[in-house]
Amino acid sequence: VPKEINDKRREENERAAELHSSFLMKMARRLYKMHQEKLLTHHNDETDWNRWKYAESLRRNFFFVNMINILGAKARLLNEQYFEPLGDDIVLQLPLPATEHMWRCCDEEEWAIAREHAMRRPANSPPVARTLRELLEQDKAGTLDASTLLPVTRLIFACAKVAPKGDSLGDL
């Protein structure tokens, strides 16, 4: 296939991706507004398994939408000049993902045990960041040990660190 045709096809795909990305951001923001109270309730504070499952699923999806958006811009699949952040009020305030043990529970009883276990911390252990904002503050203060983070949280953190300028994550 000639280079001209490949270049034209790539440009068309980039334009389509930019349009779809904008739609995805808009729908994510709308969904956040509809469920904001549930979404902002931390794992330690939620006692209803069904509400927790729903909110945790949504939270993880918001983080993935944000990561895809950032990585799409950084990989030049989306034009970085048109980068549209998901929104700090969403990404920085959401509780970070729960432990894998909690996430993989199959019933309420198993979840309650996993939740109880996750809430136990040694008395002299450093505070665990509950949000991306707290995680970034710990990093800035030099008190973050990224090796202690859950794999999904490490991905969220890494994407926040490489966010394009103009997204205040990229300006932190």
Predicted segments with their positions:
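C-terminal transcriptional activation/regulatory domains of eukaryotic transcription factors
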Residues: 1-12
